Amino acid sequence: MSTIAIVDYGMGNFHSVARALQHAAPDADIRICNRPEQIDAADRVVFPGQGAMPDCMRTLNESGLRAAVERAAASKPLMGVCVGEQMLFERSEEGGTPCLGIFPGEVRRFAGPQFADPVAADQAAAAPPAAARERLKVPHMGWNQVRQTRSHALWEGIPDGTHFYFVHSYYAAPSDPALTTGVTDYGVAFTCAVAAANIFAVQFHPEKSAEHGLRLYRNFVDWQP
């Protein structure tokens, strides 16, 4: 039986992820883990996250779990989800936060005239009413299509163009295009899935994405990188 550790550093929807994994892979031993030795002992690791990047990195560091996540990323199948995907990169524009630096690249905010960004109050005030209505809201929230840019074992049984559920204001921008395995359009074409060696990570929430999200988790449990 495969043991899967869900990293619990205090900033994520860990129980929702656990329920989805239990449904997708009832033969697996799913554990929410908040101690390094638990993560070290697991066969596979799921690294979720939600909230502000400065808070996520601070709590990860303070929890003592950072080194365990880094060891897992170097040695066993690891799946990052939402902010857990973003944290794998070098830095985030959110608070200028240094991240784990496992992948080259940065995390950027949706920005530009096509977005009705609530943090840009002067932009909203200056915009004509019709133009403001046409702008895309930030955060990007809801179902959106994922284009698979290259084949991967975790895409097995999931049609290209499948819709997954997103909730985010920032997205990963890899320095190495070869990392990208999925792209979504929301005012800009952005990377929503990355993969290299034993790591696969997604911006969307598989646990909120119905049957295809469960299939992605099942594929992760079966994956032999």
UniProtKB/Swiss-Prot annotation:
<comment type="function">
    <text>IGPS catalyzes the conversion of PRFAR and glutamine to IGP, AICAR and glutamate. The HisH subunit catalyzes the hydrolysis of glutamine to glutamate and ammonia as part of the synthesis of IGP and AICAR. The resulting ammonia molecule is channeled to the active site of HisF.</text>
</comment>
<feature type="domain" description="Glutamine amidotransferase type-1">
    <location>
        <begin position="3"/>
        <end position="225"/>
    </location>
</feature>
<dbReference type="GO" id="GO:0000105">
    <property type="term" value="P:L-histidine biosynthetic process"/>
</dbReference>
<dbReference type="GO" id="GO:0004359">
    <property type="term" value="F:glutaminase activity"/>
</dbReference>
<dbReference type="Pfam" id="PF00117">
    <property type="entry name" value="GATase"/>
</dbReference>
<feature type="active site" description="Nucleophile">
    <location>
        <position position="82"/>
    </location>
</feature>
<dbReference type="GO" id="GO:0000107">
    <property type="term" value="F:imidazoleglycerol-phosphate synthase activity"/>
</dbReference>
<protein>
    <recommendedName>
        <fullName>Imidazole glycerol phosphate synthase subunit HisH</fullName>
        <ecNumber>4.3.2.10</ecNumber>
        <ecNumber>3.5.1.2</ecNumber>
    </recommendedName>
</protein>
<keyword id="KW-0378">Hydrolase</keyword>
<keyword id="KW-0368">Histidine biosynthesis</keyword>
<dbReference type="InterPro" id="IPR010139">
    <property type="entry name" value="Imidazole-glycPsynth_HisH"/>
</dbReference>
<comment type="pathway">
    <text>Amino-acid biosynthesis; L-histidine biosynthesis; L-histidine from 5-phospho-alpha-D-ribose 1-diphosphate: step 5/9.</text>
</comment>
<feature type="active site">
    <location>
        <position position="205"/>
    </location>
</feature>
<feature type="active site">
    <location>
        <position position="207"/>
    </location>
</feature>
<keyword id="KW-0963">Cytoplasm</keyword>
<dbReference type="InterPro" id="IPR029062">
    <property type="entry name" value="Class_I_gatase-like"/>
</dbReference>
<comment type="subunit">
    <text>Heterodimer of HisH and HisF.</text>
</comment>
<dbReference type="GO" id="GO:0016829">
    <property type="term" value="F:lyase activity"/>
</dbReference>
<keyword id="KW-0456">Lyase</keyword>
<dbReference type="InterPro" id="IPR017926">
    <property type="entry name" value="GATASE"/>
</dbReference>
<dbReference type="GO" id="GO:0005737">
    <property type="term" value="C:cytoplasm"/>
</dbReference>
<keyword id="KW-0315">Glutamine amidotransferase</keyword>
<keyword id="KW-0028">Amino-acid biosynthesis</keyword>
